[in-house]
Amino acid sequence: MDYHSPYFFGYLIGLIHLLGIIAALHAVFTVRTAQGAIAWALSLLFIPYFTLIPYLIFGARSFYAYIQARRQANQEMHVAMANLNWRPWVEEALTARESDSYAALRAMPKLGRMPCLANNEVKLLIDGEATFKAIFAAIEAARNTVLVQFFIIHDDTLGKQLQRLLLRKAAEGVQVFVLYDRVGSHALPGSYSQVLRDGGVQIQAFATRRGWFNRFQVNFRNHRKIVVVDGLRGFLGGHNVGDEYLGANPHLSPWRDTHVQIAGPVLACLQESFAEDWYWATRQLPPLILPDTYPENGVLCQALASGPADPQETCALFFLEAIHSATRRVWITSPYFIPDEAIFAALRLAVLRGVDVRVLIPSRPDHRIVYAASSLFAFEAVRAGVRMFRYQPGFLHQKVVLVDDEVSAIGSANLDNRSFRLNFEITLLTVDRAFADQVEQMLQSDFDQAREITAEDSRDTHRLQQLGMRIARLISPIL
């Protein structure tokens, strides 16, 4: 090709515009929200020079290859588990008890791919020391299988402690599987994984760029945090593996986070979620274990695994259903507050119904752009009657929802677009008065250590700061 030809740049410009038209049509048919489809289509039509590459990275909203992998994983699981017949046994033997509170969440049985199961033991783990003490104790007692999944694993003091423990269990003959997100754990050196592999631990990165059609899909993340030991003890919540989660970062310390420890039939669902992700990463299935018996009573639980491979926006719809079902209160804590229009409208409607609507967010930023966008949404929420609070002692990273007097949810999902549409998340929904009372006490303690945001805070914000907040909000759908 003659790059010096007077026609070369004309051909190049024409090609870019043609690709822009094709991408715009793709956006119209695939982007889930009307606002997003319009924004992408117009920008691709008129300024494709600047938007084609960002669209390849940020435009896709459905992880199509993972959908196919999930189908294959389910087929493989059905074959592998044919003798055990594990999931039908759980569903038939341990059906959910009658619950008016769960009945109020009318969409949940169909929204969640996993069943609501009774007779679970659930324990709150408040902050990092309690969380990792419980996780390490469970792994120490492992006899058969350990499944470990985190968004972030650091090669620091806590990370090395986990590494040594897993190596010791693998040397004892325990099957150990470790899955981490490639982007979230981008700072993890290859030597960390290699030491584990050399010691008999099966470790793999969850990467969304498998295959040619997914090579640009770097905007998806696997944000789940799951640990299951011998099918007897499970853990999920907000903590990752890093010293900062124990308060070692002076700029964010003390770190406020919440995990939950689980025993019971719902662990089958946590194992299923891990198995799907592991199958995507390795095309193999880990062993899935169920104990012979369960307690005769306990907490009603549903594991809600959500992500961009779902046929609908499971995470966003869960928040909507939870807020709409509230008759007395809905308390939410999240490190990021970037609701979409539907969630924001649901919060406003709950206020109009007389519901006590409270949202607790951090007073310190870990990501300044996200913090700026969250601040603007917080000011608008206050004007709508939502009570917004900033946690004062340190950084708040927990993801907790409390609805009325029985329903609570703890997991990895934030109240933002990334969790709604881009991340793979896991949340545990619980329906139990006694456990909800514990969650209430925990959150009330957090609110007692928070400062309520007022309308005056918005008026006192400098105009340049407000401009920065509005710019941050413009890009909030991809934050």
UniProtKB/Swiss-Prot annotation:
Pfam families: PLDc, PLDc_2, PLDc_N. The chain crosses the membrane at residues 8-28, 38-58. It catalyses: 2 a 1,2-diacyl-sn-glycero-3-phospho-(1'-sn-glycerol) = a cardiolipin + glycerol. Residues 218-245, 392-419 form the PLD phosphodiesterase domain. Belongs to the phospholipase D family. Cardiolipin synthase subfamily. ClsA sub-subfamily. GO terms for biological process: cardiolipin biosynthetic process. This is Cardiolipin synthase A. One of its GO terms (cellular component) is plasma membrane. It is an enzyme of class 2 (transferase). The active site is at H223, K225, D230, H397, K399, D404. Its EC number is 2.7.8.-. It is found in: Cell inner membrane. PANTHER family: CARDIOLIPIN SYNTHASE, PHOSPHOLIPASE D. InterPro entries: Cardiolipin_synthase, CL_synthase_A, CLS_N, PLD-like_dom, PLipase_D/transphosphatidylase. GO terms for molecular function: cardiolipin synthase activity. HAMAP family: Cardiolipin_synth_ClsA.
